[in-house]
Amino acid sequence: MKRIVQTVMLLILFTFHFSLFTSSAQSAFDIIELNRNFAASNYSIYPDTVLPNLTPAPEGKVPFYISHYGRHGSRYIENRRGFDVPYKMLCSADSLNELSEAGQMAMSNMRLIFADTDKHWGDLTSYGQRQLRGIAQRMLERFPEVFSGDAHVDARSTVVPRCILSMGSAMHVMAGMNPQLRISMKASQEDMWYMNHQDPVLRKNAMTPEATKAYNMFIERREHNERLMQLLFVHPDSVRGVVNDIWLNYYLIKMGLFQLNTHLYKQTYLMDIFSSEEIYRLWQWENVWWYIMHGACKLNGAHQPYTQRYLLKKMIEEADSCIQLERPGAQLRFGHETVLLPLTCLIGINGFGLETDNLDELEAKGWWASKVFPMGSNLQFIFYRKDIHDEDVLFKVLLNEIEATLPIPTDVAPYYHWKDFREHYLKKIEAYEELRNDASSKKDQ
């Protein structure tokens, strides 16, 4: 019965996941009203179900190499703050006998979550392992030419345990499907300079005064929830000294949405106490935060995506090298959403290179971070050629296993000419590095 319920959930999730890429008619609110998982942003569940058919390659071209960067699968809440902040507020109100029946129920549900999560903070869940196994299986099934015979699979992970286990889950499936594969796995600080680079200069300058002002103006219309205060407390005004309504609202919604990643996914009380409108407002709040911190936001110079310039350059260089081989196989990298999202923005996949200083434009223009980085999210670069002597190598990008678009010309969409891609993005990276070096030189003068 449990598996049937979970299967139904996944089918529902896939329906709305696929609709994001095939229909522009649905608003973010429409999607959230029907599928609240979408509002979880980077906590949302990966829709690992039946995928749309892929566009056939031009005649004679066959897949021969895959370059990939993927996020770890579903995990537990990363640290205790997400639990302690709202729980301590409810405990303080309870000590004053100010919790309503709904407040008591909320606190009871939080205790269940704590009992399940304690000593597992940030760990990969069994659900997360299944997600990565499914992604790996579909990769082999869709591109068998890349993984035939004793093909080499070079798998690398950041040094975070949930990423290492995600890599292991994927490789276990691949080895089972083709025991001849030559699989190598590595998780080392040696690779962190590009696998999980968080540029301190860019990060420090993300929330400029202009960005902070615009952000605060945007969220002040969305951060309060007086209805929640009326629901959870007998006399809301009596607990305002011990309850911060902004953070109570924020963390309770997040906790309710997060449960979908664990075996407590049927315990939906915390999510059910909120209306779709309230959950939608939180999604708007988080979406603009992700844009400022990782998107090409003009309020801070539009440079945040360049945090992943080392990764993109490394992927280009490794692809250039692998193209020279008869059977290069696949290079798979397992990391984090704080890498995958800015990488997607740096490349400009599906319009995520959007540059604006108007945060109210994001939603209308489709800059929805939730479309990029659910648990298990991934970018797959699939390379095609006729044979090793074919100089016109083509490739396409799959974002979460669905064909994506790039902001460069092509006459074979959704395929692109590799030589065009590498030239465009190496120049883009070089231009930024020159700009940064010039700024550094002027600062030193």
Model-assigned labels for residue ranges:
Residues 26-152, 158-331, 335-445:
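Signature for phosphate-centric chemistry
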Residues 1-28:
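Bacterial Sec-dependent N-terminal signal peptides
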